Amino acid sequence: MSIELNWETLTTGPDGEELAHRIRDFIHSKFQTVPLPRFIKSVTVHDFQFGAIPPELELKDITDPLPDFYEEDPDVDYDDEDEDVEETHDYEERRSEAAASPARSGDDGLFGGQRGDGMNKLDRVASSSSSSVGRGSAPRPGAPPQTPTKSNININTRMRGEVPPQDLTSPFLGVSTPGILSGGTSNFSYFHSHLASSGLSGTQTPLAAVAGAQLGGPPQWNGLRSTGRGSGRRRSLAAASQGLDGEGFTPSHSRTSSTVSNADLQTASLGGFGGHLTPTSFLRSGQQTLREKHSVSTLAPTSVGTSRPPTRDLTTTMSTAQEDGQGGDGNCESSSAAAAGNEQNESDSSDRTKYRERRIEDMQAVFRIKYAGDVKLLLTADILLDYPMPSFVGIPVRLSITGLTFDGVGVVAHIRKRVHFCFLSPEDALAAVGSASGKEAGDGDEYGDTSGGAAAAAASSSASAATTPQGVATLASPAGAAPGSDEKAGGNTRMGGLLQEIRVESEIGQREGGKQSLKNVGKVEKFILEQVRRIFEEEFVYPSFWTFLV
């Protein structure tokens, strides 16, 4: 279906002049970024005119917009266009949130509805073992007598699963161990044996269970930096360790230094560890294990508020996992590998492109565009003379593009309040429009244009600029090529370049007998034509496209 375009309304008047000036400035800015050859000093664009001959438009198809048209630009605010801001979303992020919802519900149950049963068991065990924990351990010779201090109260409070309001950053906060929750004896022997490096394998002492005894609680309670990506590691490590039964343990590579006071360590050594583990030996025996394993918070006395880089944590985690795997701790190795994989997936998902929501009213029109008009582009180039020395003097050359021939396929998409426009490459245009019909098979090109052979020749890299005696340069086809000599394979014709012909007029110095006074003007013309073609193909041909607000 042919479409008549009111060319005069679009190109004349104040709006048409402003559009012409903007196109001129755009082409000039592009020439300033082009690396110039040695014999050209500079290129300046002075004027652009649309001409009086309009292009011919033929509607070929109406389809759904290309996916790239829905891609979000982080520098653009779409709130003015969309009535519902939440329509803009990331599909991958939605899936990750839906997958993480069971883990979040498990965390809520730990401190919510499931807390009642667990607390009943915990209270019974704590009440029966309070004497052994608080008073049963014989004091060490020379140690001060134990008195009910604030730290002892905190330890007993933590054993009952309660939250002491005065210390919300301790890694022992909200301790919950499998031995206590299952109704058995306390697993402080696990804790002490692991810190004393007794050599228990991962099958006897689950890594996540030991980590849970040290950390306890979700990340927002134990001083770790809580992020949305913790749910993926939670599921991987819980499946690898099988020691927490979904108690909401969340390891994290990016973490801040835990705050542990000497009073807490002293109380733990006197009450919870049998009275023979001092803070110094506690740090010496467990420093390497606690510092390097990704599932355990660091207890080393570092400055508060600092954090280790995630890259360094990931490297040390992988190296530690390999060492532990050689020593027989298979669960640690699998947990480290799972955490490393989740870390990579999360970094990829954060950089994943966001797309806008599709609507049923979005549409795209495919046009075939023919143009053989008198568009004008005026520019000057300073060429350098190398005599008597290199770059001795610069002479301005006036170049005028007086017309061009174009044949291609364009795409116009309307999405909300934006219009996207681009041309298709010859290969994409052939796929979008289809092969030649039987009626047009005998014509010069796919669309029945007898100048298709010249178009294909002009698109090749061997095209050159031929200068006539009148000073008009055009893109000529290479030797042996003739109009209408398109390449045909299997009955399908191949489209040529979009810009089939560019007419250039050059003026320099004084003319004698209709000849140019300088020989390298042809090189300047060839360079200008090649750059015009390159700018057009890079800026207007898909996947590059232009967006207009309507």
UniProtKB/Swiss-Prot annotation:
<keyword id="KW-0496">Mitochondrion</keyword>
<dbReference type="GO" id="GO:0005789">
    <property type="term" value="C:endoplasmic reticulum membrane"/>
</dbReference>
<keyword id="KW-0472">Membrane</keyword>
<dbReference type="GO" id="GO:0045040">
    <property type="term" value="P:protein insertion into mitochondrial outer membrane"/>
</dbReference>
<dbReference type="GO" id="GO:0032865">
    <property type="term" value="C:ERMES complex"/>
</dbReference>
<feature type="region of interest" description="Disordered">
    <location>
        <begin position="218"/>
        <end position="356"/>
    </location>
</feature>
<feature type="compositionally biased region" description="Low complexity">
    <location>
        <begin position="125"/>
        <end position="140"/>
    </location>
</feature>
<keyword id="KW-0256">Endoplasmic reticulum</keyword>
<keyword id="KW-1000">Mitochondrion outer membrane</keyword>
<keyword id="KW-0813">Transport</keyword>
<dbReference type="GO" id="GO:0015914">
    <property type="term" value="P:phospholipid transport"/>
</dbReference>
<feature type="compositionally biased region" description="Polar residues">
    <location>
        <begin position="251"/>
        <end position="269"/>
    </location>
</feature>
<keyword id="KW-0445">Lipid transport</keyword>
<dbReference type="InterPro" id="IPR031468">
    <property type="entry name" value="SMP_LBD"/>
</dbReference>
<dbReference type="Pfam" id="PF10296">
    <property type="entry name" value="MMM1"/>
</dbReference>
<dbReference type="InterPro" id="IPR027532">
    <property type="entry name" value="Mdm12"/>
</dbReference>
<dbReference type="GO" id="GO:0008289">
    <property type="term" value="F:lipid binding"/>
</dbReference>
<comment type="similarity">
    <text>Belongs to the MDM12 family.</text>
</comment>
<feature type="compositionally biased region" description="Polar residues">
    <location>
        <begin position="296"/>
        <end position="323"/>
    </location>
</feature>
<feature type="compositionally biased region" description="Acidic residues">
    <location>
        <begin position="69"/>
        <end position="90"/>
    </location>
</feature>
<dbReference type="InterPro" id="IPR019411">
    <property type="entry name" value="MMM1_dom"/>
</dbReference>
<keyword id="KW-0446">Lipid-binding</keyword>
<feature type="compositionally biased region" description="Polar residues">
    <location>
        <begin position="278"/>
        <end position="289"/>
    </location>
</feature>
<comment type="subunit">
    <text>Component of the ER-mitochondria encounter structure (ERMES) or MDM complex, composed of MMM1, MDM10, MDM12 and MDM34. A MMM1 homodimer associates with one molecule of MDM12 on each side in a pairwise head-to-tail manner, and the SMP-LTD domains of MMM1 and MDM12 generate a continuous hydrophobic tunnel for phospholipid trafficking.</text>
</comment>
<comment type="function">
    <text>Component of the ERMES/MDM complex, which serves as a molecular tether to connect the endoplasmic reticulum (ER) and mitochondria. Components of this complex are involved in the control of mitochondrial shape and protein biogenesis, and function in nonvesicular lipid trafficking between the ER and mitochondria. MDM12 is required for the interaction of the ER-resident membrane protein MMM1 and the outer mitochondrial membrane-resident beta-barrel protein MDM10.</text>
</comment>
<dbReference type="GO" id="GO:1990456">
    <property type="term" value="P:mitochondrion-endoplasmic reticulum membrane tethering"/>
</dbReference>
<feature type="region of interest" description="Disordered">
    <location>
        <begin position="474"/>
        <end position="493"/>
    </location>
</feature>
<dbReference type="GO" id="GO:0000002">
    <property type="term" value="P:mitochondrial genome maintenance"/>
</dbReference>
<feature type="region of interest" description="Disordered">
    <location>
        <begin position="62"/>
        <end position="168"/>
    </location>
</feature>
<feature type="domain" description="SMP-LTD">
    <location>
        <begin position="1"/>
        <end position="550"/>
    </location>
</feature>
<protein>
    <recommendedName>
        <fullName>Mitochondrial distribution and morphology protein 12</fullName>
    </recommendedName>
</protein>
<feature type="compositionally biased region" description="Polar residues">
    <location>
        <begin position="148"/>
        <end position="157"/>
    </location>
</feature>
